[in-house]
Swiss-Prot record:
It is an enzyme of class 2 (transferase). InterPro entries: P-loop_NTPase. It comes from the Eukaryota. Belongs to the YFH7 family. Keywords: ATP-binding, Kinase, Nucleotide-binding, Transferase. ATP-dependent kinase-like protein; part of the gene cluster that mediates the biosynthesis of notoamide, a fungal indole alkaloid that belongs to a family of natural products containing a characteristic bicyclo[2.2.2]diazaoctane core. The first step of notoamide biosynthesis involves coupling of L-proline and L-tryptophan by the bimodular NRPS notE', to produce cyclo-L-tryptophan-L-proline called brevianamide F. This is ATP-dependent kinase-like protein notR'. It comes from Aspergillus versicolor. Notoamides have been shown to exhibit antitumoral activities. Notoamides A-C show moderate cytotoxicity against HeLa and L1210 cells with IC(50) values in the range of 22-52 mg/ml, but the IC(50) value of notoamide D is greater than 100 mg/ml. Moreover, notoamide C induces G2/M-cell cycle arrest at a concentration of 6.3 mg/ml. The keyword Transcription does not apply. Signal peptide: none annotated. GO terms for molecular function: ATP binding; kinase activity. Its EC number is 2.7.1.-.
Length: 172
């Protein structure tokens, strides 16, 4: 779903560009309609003449989506879609979710998420230090997470975000 981030130029053209750029990752900074159209295309009946479907990717080096970068061949029978808003009970995300065979939700403990986000924000250069990362997490990431949890559609499976540790505990 990262390919459906709105390009930085589009965020800069919004009525409040500073907020749009700072909040990148919030629902309103994604092309939800474009994602919905992708899911619709993926649900079309396959025939011998069905074309390859292309989806955008996200290039972290240029910090923008790359159109038509991911090829999904008509022979693909299982397609896994991943992203923050895929189970959000708000249009167009809820319409896209209705077209999916199953929806799974990975729940991550808030402290584990915070630690991972601090590391990611500092390592990727989004912020200069841990204090700035903590501020960004509270003013963007956790707002997004709270919105998703509060407005999530029912899902078929809840996956714990620490499943690796849980799996390892069972092996020991």
């Amino acid at each position: 779903m990262d390919g459906y981030h709105l390009p930085r130029a589009q965020l800069a053209a919004m009525p409040d560009p500073a907020t749009a750029i700072y909040r990148r990752g919030a629902e309103f900074t994604f092309d939800g309609e474009g994602f919905y159209r992708l899911v619709q295309r993926l649900r079309e009946r396959l025939t011998a003449a069905s074309p390859t479907v292309f989806a955008p990717s996200f290039d972290h080096a240029i910090k923008d989506p790359v159109p038509d970068d991911v090829a999904i061949s008509p022979g693909s029978r299982v397609i896994i879609l991943e992203g923050l808003y895929l189970s959000l009970n708000r249009e167009p995300w809820s319409s896209a979710a209705a077209l999916m065979d199953e929806s799974w939700f990975v729940g991550v403990d808030r402290e584990i998420a915070r630690a991972r986000l601090v590391k990611r924000h500092v390592t990727s250069g989004i912020v200069p230090d841990t204090a700035a990362a903590e501020h960004r997490i509270l003013s963007t990431d956790f707002l997004n997470a709270d919105d998703i949890v509060k407005n999530r559609l029912p899902v078929q499976e809840m996956v714990p975000g620490n499943w690796r540790e849980l799996s390892q505990d069972r092996l020991d």
